[in-house]
Amino acid sequence: METYETSIGTQSYPPTLFPPPLGTGGFTTSGYIHALVDSTSNSNSNSNTNSNTNSNTNSNSDTKIPIVQISDDSHITHDSFKPYMEYHDASHLRNRNISKADQVESTEVMEQFTQWSNYKMRSRSPTINAKPIRHTSQRRTDFTSKNELSKFSKNHNFIFHKGFLKRQHSIRREDRQAKVRSRFRSKKELTSVLNYIELEQMDIANVLASQPVNLHAIRNLTSRDPAVTPIPFLRSQMYATSSRPPYLRNRSISRKLPKSQPGSLPTTMPATATKTIKQNSTTPTTRSVYNKNVGRSNTSPSVLYHPKRRGKLNTKSHARKEQLLLELWREYLMLVITQRTQLRLTLLCSPGSASNESSVCSSNASDLDMSLLSTPSSLFQMAGETKSNPIIIPDSQDDSILSSDPF
């Protein structure tokens, strides 16, 4: 233990710990800190301790941890802090050099395989103090009158005024989170362009990017409040429109046509079905409470791109898929057990074995193999056995295959 003299008395601390700061542990706040790094004073202060303490302090003196002495001498100046500050700066510089050396080694390794320096230079952000790029102002107002347009349209001439169809790349638009570069900023600009276009004489090949055109047909309605609802009496291509307002419609998320059995759908729609449809459309149903909260359908992009949210909405379908995976895994394990049992029976009934029943096994080997492959569960139900007490085929004493496991 190391001793420290104060204005109050002598206090001892462990050799590996520094004394408490000023204002704590009975010290006065008017004290000053002396950093004494001399190793001789360290050895002299430890001469009166026991042998166990000497061994600890000698090992501690090798590391040259500075001793902090607190006193109330008013003549001490800030120059006494220099040894301690020099020690602190030296340790800080040493740690920085070590981390810098590790960084250089990792950079050299990256340079062996990639152009890491070039990539790092490109990824650096531009300087903050750089001045923004200035552009000349562009006029975007269309001053063309209708008389002028009608005059030039007779001769199929066009008027391109200053600033026609030009986009100004401003700094504010570049800093937006959603960079949507619209062709026209206002309805007036779109109208001024459409005045020069004749939609009746326009060739559709100039508008479409590719030759084939995809036309999507409605098969499954999955929106929350669909305006078109399927009727089970009609065919899959025919749908009936709903005349009820949105708050009176059924709020089921998934709306699919039921699977029709062959021969169940008639060729023509019966008269009873038309009557029921008319009655349902004329007689209003009981008004349900309208939910003002905005809900998302099952086909919204947020549901499709976030599996966690999709699992919350479709808990039943997730449980059904999980049950299907468990059934497939169980069937796979049963098939593996069956094949290993079949291999063992084939080796036991091989012609090289010395058992007396080799001829019987070889005659019935094909039938047994087919039964095992076709019905795996029948393996544990032969001779009145159950799954808890399966059949175990013991090894013969004269058999060349020595194994204690049944499979």
Curated annotation (Swiss-Prot):
Regulation: induction: Expression is regulated by the ACE2 and SWI5 transcription factors.
Note: Present with 504 molecules/cell in log phase SD medium.
Residue span of region Disordered: 41-64, 277-315
Residues bearing the modification Phosphoserine: S260, S264, S300, S302
Gene: NIS1
Species of provenance: Saccharomyces cerevisiae (strain ATCC 204508 / S288c) (Baker's yeast)
GO BP terms: axial cellular bud site selection; establishment of protein localization; mitotic nuclear division
UniProt entry keywords in alphabetical sequence: Cytoplasm, Phosphoprotein
Function: May be involved in a mitotic signaling network. Binds sumoylated proteins and may stabilize SUMO chains.
DNA repair recorded as keyword: no
Any single Gene Ontology cellular-component annotation: cellular bud neck split septin rings
Principal place of residence: other
Biased composition (Basic residues): 306-315
Subunit composition and interactions: Interacts with CBF2, GIS1, NAP1, PRM8, REI1, SHS1 and SMT3.
Descriptive protein name: Protein NIS1
Molecular function (Gene Ontology), one example: SUMO binding
Cellular compartments annotated: Bud neck; Cytoplasm, Cell cortex
Source superkingdom: Eukaryota
Residue ranges with Polar residues bias: 277-302
Residue spans of biased composition, Low complexity class: 41-61
Motif SUMO-binding, chain ranges: 391-398
